[in-house]
């Protein structure tokens, strides 16, 4: 598997295999996206709720940056059309 010059589709496939991905031109060092799995949260009744959607399963793309983790990151059109993704 190549490690740089990836399309967004190739980056998604790499994340499904446990890899971290980033774009060359992102601002800030150490920023990347990865696939988060086994997602759960504590609701207002202090109950742990496991997220498990029939279509997407229990996974979401997480953006890790200088301010922490953003779960459910959404790619821009520029992100989706770029071929400058690389494996971290």
What are these regions (language model features)?
Residues 1-4, 71:
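Residues at structural and domain junctions
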Residues 3-47, 52, 63:
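Catalytic phosphate/metal-binding cores of nucleic-acid and nucleotide-processing enzymes, i.e., regions
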